[in-house]
């Protein structure tokens, strides 16, 4: 075997190895590209699924909520399944239930469930949240209904007495001012030129009790 045969053999082996290497790299690139495409498709589907559910089922949820009657239960409970106890309709008087959590009330109706009719108000000219005095009770207007506190003046039923009781309340604030005046008066007595030397003599004489006999009136007892 001549040297030419050896060269041809080496050339053939190297060419075969290069072809095998190119084939393996092509297979790896193809496999990685397929995995990336699958991942992208799965990600796009995952992102689109909540949006599709929201757009397609929002009308169904709101429409089914509008169709419930005042005495009809919900078809099923979202939290506990079919075996849970049914709850009544969330909105009244033609209100629209949005996502099962709050109501959009029509005109002249208010409240959490549109249960209060503003045209049938017990408050008269009072607005929502206003206070008034009615039959010796302090009342507040809440959604067209009066809610009264217990009786404020048990023995008197005159609004003037009720107002007077509140007017005399702040007078108790004058007690601290009187307590501040007492040290000032004592200090003034001490600074006077004719002030006594002993502090016990500062006590007014009106506070000293006189000694009197404890016997019956008309009978004189000597001390």
Swiss-Prot record:
> What family does this belong to?
Belongs to the EGF-CFC (Cripto-1/FRL1/Cryptic) family.
UniProt organism field: Homo sapiens (Human)
Q: Coiled-coil regions in this chain?
A: none
* Residues the record marks as carrying a glycan: 52
One Gene Ontology cellular component annotation held by this UniProt entry: extracellular region
Gene3D superfamilies from the xrefs?
Laminin (2.10.25.10)
Instruction: Supply one GO BP term.
Output: blood vessel development
Q: Among its keywords, does the record have Ribosomal protein?
A: no
This protein's name: Cryptic family protein 1B
Gene Ontology MF term list: activin receptor binding; nodal binding
List the cysteine pairs that form cystine: 90-97, 91-103, 105-114
Alphabetically ordered keywords of this record = Developmental protein, Disulfide bond, EGF-like domain, Gastrulation, Glycoprotein, Secreted, Signal
